[in-house]
């Protein structure tokens, strides 16, 4: 990591070289933004340029691009596989930006890949103050992962590295000090296909990137089950669609040895017309109309999940680390639960709350690192990668079969 420090003196110059000059003024931004339809990457690019001096990582032909923001916690806000006029593949929450209001609980700006810390709830929670009831009124996202800017250590054409020193306080009353290093790398086509272990298909458009996220214990004490600890929590926010479905392959096995296949009652049990288990895959309807969340433990989770939307001809694949022998933290809002038994991955579909309000709508695919039982100075890394394929159904079908073990026809006939 020592080489990272050489970039500190000039990160903003490098970042500025990469992208449009946000300093050019709102008039130019508005003019350029309205040259593109809402929902396109070009629209979001110019919209977000009015909020931050963005970092844009680009592929060789300019079709594959991703937007990264240091001001907004090192998020990958959105991406495109087909250039400026192509579909914006991440969820951008315009209404939160446009409100200008800072919410005390969470500021849901969006972002198709964001760094968070867990656990959200439970004995080790870093979202609730000690002793309070774990209900929404008392839930507060730690500011370093919600509203504080991060530092740029390095920015190049296809890679950027960001850093944030932070303190989080847990439900036990322990103050944890850590440093986060987040490296985001745009993958060229050949590298992306090699990473997935499948043959390249020239008929498909593709944007892919890898994120390597590391936390370091900066305290003078070890993080243990007595002090409480944290985990890395990666969340991808994508746009829902009427026929979109999340697909999660799982490891088969007896419940006695591997635990139940899926935890599906986070917000009440998910109805059968929205959640289905067929063969060795779990299917979740992601239309943005019904709030639902599921999770898989480390013995059930494979290192892959997907989401398919036939209307936008998009198949998204996420890959991530899973350690079958590690401890994962419980994130439920219940301090009575065992804090050392939790999920390794989750999926979410947004929907209206009881009062009719809604944050999105959006869908999420999430992955979690093992518990960070770290001695002073030790680090823990978690890798989470995103691949968006755009193309005809027949070509996407090959990818789905090879990576998810199911066909597009099976996905479309589940619900």
Question: Residue spans of the language-model regions?
Answer:
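A contiguous, surface-exposed recognition patch within enzymatic or periplasmic domains that forms
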Residues: 53-66, 70-128, 218-378, 393-404
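Short, hydrophobic/aromatic-enriched beta-strand segments in well-ordered soluble domains
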Residues: 70, 164, 182-184, 378-391
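Extended, loop-rich substrate-binding clefts of extracytoplasmic carbohydrate-active enzymes
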Residues: 27, 34-37, 45, 129-206, ...
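Bacterial N-terminal signal peptides that target proteins for export
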Residues: 2-11
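Hydrophobic beta-strand positions in extracellular immunoglobulin-like domains
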Residues: 214-215, 386
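C-terminal motif of bacterial Sec signal peptides marking the signal peptidase cleavage site
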Residues: 20-22
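Short peripheral tails and domain-boundary helices/loops at the edges of structured domains
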Residues: 401-415
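Short, Gly/Pro- and small/polar-rich lid/capping loops
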Residues: 28-60
């Amino acid at each position: 990591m020592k080489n990272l420090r050489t970039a500190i003196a000039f990160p903003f110059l490098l970042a500025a070289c990469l992208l449009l000059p946000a300093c050019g003024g709102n008039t130019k931004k508005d003019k350029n933004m309205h040259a593109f339809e809402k929902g396109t990457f070009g629209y979001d690019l110019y919209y977000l340029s009015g909020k931050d001096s963005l970092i844009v990582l680009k592929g060789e032909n300019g079709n594959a691009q991703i937007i990264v923001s240091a001001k907004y916690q090192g998020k990958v806000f959105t991406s495109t596989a087909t250039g400026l006029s192509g579909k914006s593949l991440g969820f951008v929450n315009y209404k939160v930006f446009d409100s200008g209001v800072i919410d005390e609980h969470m500021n849901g700006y969006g972002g198709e890949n964001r760094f968070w810390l867990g656990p959200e709830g439970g004995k080790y929670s870093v979202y609730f103050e000690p002793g309070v009831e774990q209900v929404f009124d008392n839930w507060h996202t730690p500011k370093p992962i919600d509203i504080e800017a991060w530092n740029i250590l390095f920015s190049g054409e296809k890679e950027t590295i960001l850093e944030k020193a932070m303190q989080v306080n847990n439900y036990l009353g322990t103050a944890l000090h850590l440093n986060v290093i987040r490296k985001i790398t745009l993958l060229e086509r050949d590298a992306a296909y090699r990473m997935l272990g499948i043959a390249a298909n020239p008929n498909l458009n593709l944007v892919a990137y890898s994120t390597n996220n590391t936390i370091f214990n900066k305290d003078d004490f070890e993080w243990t089950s007595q002090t409480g600890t944290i985990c890395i929590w990666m969340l991808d926010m994508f746009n829902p669609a009427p026929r979109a479905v999340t697909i999660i392959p799982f490891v088969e096995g007896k419940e006695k040895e591997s635990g139940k296949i899926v935890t599906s009652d986070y917000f009440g049990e998910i109805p059968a017309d929205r959640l289905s288990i067929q063969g060795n895959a779990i299917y979740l309807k992601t239309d943005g109309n019904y709030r639902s969340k599921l999770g898989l433990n480390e013995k059930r989770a494979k290192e892959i999940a997907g989401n398919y939307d036939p209307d936008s001809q998009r198949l998204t694949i996420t890959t991530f680390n899973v350690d079958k022998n590690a401890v994962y933290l419980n994130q439920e809002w219940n301090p009575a639960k065992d804090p050392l038994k939790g999920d390794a991955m989750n999926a979410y579909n947004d929907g209206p709350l009881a009062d009719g309000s809604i944050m999105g709508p959006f869908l999420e695919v999430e992955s979690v690192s093992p518990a960070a039982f770290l001695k002073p100075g030790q680090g823990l890394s978690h890798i989470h990668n995103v691949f968006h394929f755009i193309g005809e159904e027949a070509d996407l079908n090959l990818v789905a079969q090879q990576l998810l073990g199911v066909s597009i026809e099976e996905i479309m006939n589940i619900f």
